[in-house]
From Swiss-Prot:
A lipid is attached at C23 (N-palmitoyl cysteine). This is Flagellar L-ring protein. It comes from the Bacteria. One of its GO terms (biological process) is bacterial-type flagellum-dependent cell motility. Its main location: membrane. It is found in: Cell outer membrane; Bacterial flagellum basal body. Belongs to the FlgH family. GO terms for cellular component: bacterial-type flagellum basal body, distal rod, L ring; cell outer membrane. Residues 1-22 form the signal peptide. Keywords: Bacterial flagellum, Cell outer membrane, Lipoprotein, Membrane, Palmitate, Signal. The keyword Nucleotide-binding does not apply. It is a lipid-anchor. It comes from Stenotrophomonas maltophilia (strain R551-3). A lipid is attached at C23 (S-diacylglycerol cysteine).
Amino acid sequence: MSPLSNFARTALACAVAALLGGCVIAGDVRPYPTMAPIQPIMPPQAQPTAGAIYAAGPTLQLYSDRRARDVGDLLTISLLENTTAQTSANTATNKESNLSLGTPSIFGAPVTLGGKDILSASAKGARDFTGKGNSAQSNRLQGNVTVTVIQRLPNGNLVVQGQKNLRLNQGDELVQVQGIVRPGDISQDNTIPSSRVAEARIVYGGRGPVAQSNAMGWLSRFFNSGLTPF
């Protein structure tokens, strides 16, 4: 067997491996952020105080509604997110260079050979570059996610965290919400809009055939990366 055929076999095997690798990578386009396993969060138990009428711990609310205020309470966040972004960039450069050397003379007479100037020279160069880019993006997210109060800050604000996993027939959907809310912004039905969540971290993603159909192939990603010289 000739060395050329061995090289062809090796190249074919590498190409097949690259194609299979590209198919596997395209399945999970965007990895999900890691979150700690969900565990019930309970407020600390108050230690009994001998000989005292009142004990430390959560108070008994007799005349107030059941809004989230303590560690372990549940709160529903209404996701109402609308974002629109648009950018445009244009770049154009042009440079021209001209160089000309006149015919030298000796004792007032030009240096010629056969009646033609042999020492005169000229050069000319030009460079042009044009670049253009446009980007437009619009996102809309609506829904409800119930989160858990994981910490109560000294100023009374609540740190909340929660996620929702949906397994559908065409893939998986995940919504993660983290942030800080102010108890005064919580409505009577124990809900709060996402626009009232400070330090908000809202993640929405999907896996499956639908998400895979919106992803570039490995060869398209290569030609759109900074590795290609074109």
